[in-house]
């Protein structure tokens, strides 16, 4: 039996997490991790909804036979303990240390009414 097993390589276990690129910006999404996978569910923290942009670097987790998209690579350099929420076009909310809330964007709206700036 020992001789019959010589030359055989054991199967490699499949990775449980991979970095890939979003190919379809929707939910379910498409993602490239060496081959394209479609119908990949998109997950985020509770109360937070997002969709990856096409070409964005994403984290793909294996969930049984399926995969799920769990997030994108972080950009920027927040201080330890800070929380940044960034959107397209430079809009951002930054929860900083000391209780400071920093809001950046071209307009600030409350219940649809423009408080500052101009809505395009």
Question: What residue spans do the PLM features occupy?
Answer:
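Right-handed beta-helix
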Residues: 2-23, 48-120
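Beta-strand/loop nucleic-acid-binding surfaces
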Residues: 37-50
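Short, basic/aromatic beta-hairpin or loop at an interaction surface
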Residues: 28-39
């Amino acid at each position: 039996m020992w001789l019959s097993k010589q030359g055989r390589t054991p199967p490699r276990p499949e990775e449980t997490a991979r970095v890939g690129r979003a190919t379809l910006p929707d939910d379910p999404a498409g993602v490239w991790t060496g081959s394209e996978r479609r119908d990949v569910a998109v997950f985020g923290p509770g109360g937070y909804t997002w969709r990856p942009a096409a070409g964005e670097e994403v984290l793909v987790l294996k969930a049984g036979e399926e995969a799920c998209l769990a997030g994108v690579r972080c950009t920027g350099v927040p201080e330890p303990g800070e929380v940044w929420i960034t959107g397209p076009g430079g809009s951002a909310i930054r929860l900083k240390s000391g209780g400071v809330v920093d809001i950046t964007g071209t307009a600030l709206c409350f219940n649809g009414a423009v408080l500052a700036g101009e809505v395009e």
